[in-house]
Every structure is written in structure tokens, then in C-alpha cells.
Amino acid sequence: MHPQMKILTLAAVLILAAANAVGQQFQVMEASIADIHRSLQSGKLTCRSLVQQYLDRINAYDQQGPALNAMLYVNPKALEQAEAMDQAFKRGAKLKPLQCIPLVLKDVFDTADMPTTGGSLALKGMQPAKDGFTVARFREAGALILGKTNMHELALAGVTASSLGGQTKNPYELTRTPGGSSGGTGVALAANFATVGTGSDTVNSIRSPASANSLVGMRPTRGLISRAGVIPVSFTQDAVGPITRTVADAAVMLDVMAGYDPDDPVTAFGVGKIPHTYTAFLDRNGLKGARIGVLRTLFGSEPDHQEVNRVMADALEVLKKQGATLVEVNDPAFDTGMLASDLDVQKWEYKYDLNNYLKAQPNPPVHSLAELIATGNYHKPSLEKFLASAEAQQNGLNEPDYKDRRVKIDDLRVRLANALAKDNLVALVYPHQKRLPVMIGNMNQAERNGILASLTGFPAITVPAGFSAPTAGAPIGVPVGIEFLGQPFSEPQLLKIAYSFEQATHARKPPQSTPPLPGK
């Protein structure tokens, strides 16, 4: 070989080795937005190497090994887009809030470059014409959309099973469900397939997978974040929000997602109520002096509730040790089982909402709920009864029962606001789910408490509280989430107390089923 050629070959090898070394210096496990940005700025990390590490983990654990089945689509241009971000950064591009942050979307968020299907075979291949509002915001903020996650089909139940994606497993106990309906996002983040993600929440669906996967899930005040460009369920109850591993990352996500959108007129109520940055409220001492109501109505008292109650008892002690004053709140009007049976309005609004969404799509596989049902291509064990009931509503929004429920929801909103105001409470606290998530095969994710926030539109955040006792199937136990609910647009205060609790406990642990890859 010519001496000059040898020199060039050696140089190429050294460059390749240096590039690989850059990626290997960075530990992707549990990495936060701030961790990634520090490493990008210091030169210890490239966007491409970061994305490659996440892709390697998806390849190793999503369909192989534990076969978690969290991902529906992986962005085929992820590495190409990451390389473009690296080149722009080298040219002096500004570091944006989500610059090079690999993000996964629940498959209800419209994306111009990937299908949006709600996990349904009936909607397979449906390609929106443009990004939804929040997806566009993410791209503007520099995020890299790594892929879209499995979910409980059409966001209509809580065990994360779909006709298109199958059953997603809980990485902490592989025979257990991961919550839902945003369970694919929850599992992807728990298993470190991405940095942050999104969910939608009609009753429990952001906070349930957060609780079940040792994550942070924020359901915002109705009107804070646009729902335009998201497959809907109920215009009264729907919200979208972040799912993350840390409270700080949830605050960054809120900064990007919150804002007025004329395509979702309810966001007009958020104008003037959004701070310059939610990260300003991340205070380790945020619980000091806080008055928090313990909503005993939402705790269980049966043997199935013992593990959750044990974790919650320890969590309440932490709140007190960090300087919070706890006030007992007992109001049977807040019983979530009763609220679900007597006030939930999904059945009356679903056909109206879904049909309007499908009409706005350029070439949908079906054009209405009736056509979707007629295909038979949906998860019948969990959806058949609800879909038939929703389709049977000939004049749903004018039905007397629906109107009566809307009046009761207004009354509930006033009652809840007063429960907080009369005792000068910054928040109410309770377990997100009274018991551990159900095992795979059960179609009912029983005894979740999310509906109080969903009906009223009040904000709530779920944070890791601890784990059940370890078992052979769950070597570190099953995650348990604590939920804080506050007055409308009190997200800053909720983030403050949630961050203080998180920093006092550091309760989150990654699952043992998806360890670091060799050499990574």
C-alpha cells in the first residue's frame, strides 16, 4: 500500500474510533434533557450517537429479549435527521429547548411523516396531511421524533392492547399490564428507548402508565395545551401532556407544549396563565409550608390495596418530613367509582368527535365510527361493547342523560375547587391506582383515580412513590405512583411540590428486564 494511502486509512480509522468513543462516553440510561444538552455542548456526545444508542436498545428489547412491544413505528430517518442536527450544531446553530432530544409519541398524535392509527387495524396506514399542534411545537423546539408507541386501541381502555400492535408488557413484571392507554410511551421511557414522550388522557391515560412504570405524568389544566391534531375521545374530558422520567423534564416539555391554538378554542382560557418557564418552579424545598389534603376517599381498604397503601403511607411521611402540613379530606362526592358510572360522558361525545376527526383526514381508511365498526378490525375483547354503545347514540349531545351529566360535572368542579380553597390547600394527594396494575389478560384496569381531574379539567401530576414488595416475577417490585391534584392553572405549584418530593425520595428505578447493553 502506498505510504500516503496508509496515512489516510489510519486517519479514517482514528476518526471512526473517535466518533464511536464520543458516543460511548455518554451513559444513555436514565439520561435527562439537561444531561444530554451538557454532553452535546461539551463535545462528549453527538446527536447521531445518542439516537443510535436508543435504536440499539429498541432493537434489543422491544421485539427480542423481554419483547416489551412498546413501539408501533420507528422513524426510518432518525439517524439521518440526527446527523443533520449535528452538522447544524457544528455550524453554530442555537441549542433549542429540545435540541436533539429523542421523543416518542403515543400513536394518536398526527405526524406528517408517519402514520397515525390509534393502534387500530381499521386505521392502518392513515397518513395525516400535517403535524398536529404539539408535534409542530416539538419540531420547532429541536426535538427528534424517534417513533410512535403502542397504546390501548383508540385510547379507549387501560391495559395497552391493540389490534395493530398487540399487547404491551410491563417491564417491571412481564406478565403484568403497563397501565394505559398511553402504555407504549410509559414502557418506552421506563426501558430507556427515548428521553421523553407524550400521552393523551381522557380518564387516566397519561398518569396510569406513569404510575405503572415509575415515571412522571402530567395531565394539564383543560385549555393549557392544544388537543388539535390528536385522535379524540371526548371534548369534555380529553387532554394531552408529557410523560417523562423526571419532573424537570416534564417542566421543559410543558414549556414547549403549552400555548394558544385557535384550532382548539378552549386554549383561550390559558392565555395569560403560562409562566415564562415552568422550570423556574423546580424547588427542592417546595414542600416546606405547603398545605396538602390527603383525599382518603381515594384509598382502598381491602387486601388487594395493602401494597399500594404501604407505599403511600411512607410517601405521606416524606411529605411531612419535607415541611408539608397534611389535612385529612373525606368527601364521598369524590369517589372515583361513582364518578365513572354517574358522570363520565365519553359514550355520548365519542361518535361526534371521531367522525369529525376522520372527516378532516385526506384519505382515511374509514370515514366514520360506523364504518370502523363494520370492518371488524379492532380489539373486540375490550372495545366491542363501548363502540356499539357510542354508535347507538343518534343524538348524543342532546340526550337528557348527557345534559344531566354535564350539569353534574359543573357542580363537581365547584365542589372540588372549594375543597381546596376552604382549607387553603395547594393540592390534594392520593394514589393514582388503589391497587397494582392488573395482569395481562384482564381487560379492566381496575380502581384508578384519574377521573376526578379528567371530569373537572383540573391539573394533576403523578410521580414515582415506590415499589411493591419484590417477587419472583417482579424482582424489584411493581411501581406505585402518587398523584397531586391542584386548582386550574396551578401547574407551577404542582411541579414545585412534585419536584420536592422527587428529590427527597429518588424513588424511580429502571427495570431489570432492560439492563445497559454490553459496552454501552
Role assignments for model-derived ranges:
Residues 60, 191-296, 301-302, 313-322, ...:
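Structural helix-boundary/capping segments
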Residues 18-19:
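N-terminal signal peptide c-region/cleavage motif recognized by signal peptidases
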Residues 25-203, 221, 245, 289, ...:
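Gly/Ser-rich catalytic/binding loops embedded in alpha/beta enzyme cores
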Residues 125, 267-272, 399-403, 423, ...:
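Short, surface-exposed loop/helix-turn segments at secondary-structure junctions
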Residues 118-120, 168-169, 181, 231-239, ...:
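Flexible glycine/proline-enriched surface loops and loop-helix/loop-strand junctions
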Residues 1-9:
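Bacterial N-terminal signal peptides that target proteins for export
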Residues 99-118, 280-297, 347-417, 462-481:
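Short helix-loop capping/hinge segments that flank enzyme active sites or metal/cofactor-binding pockets
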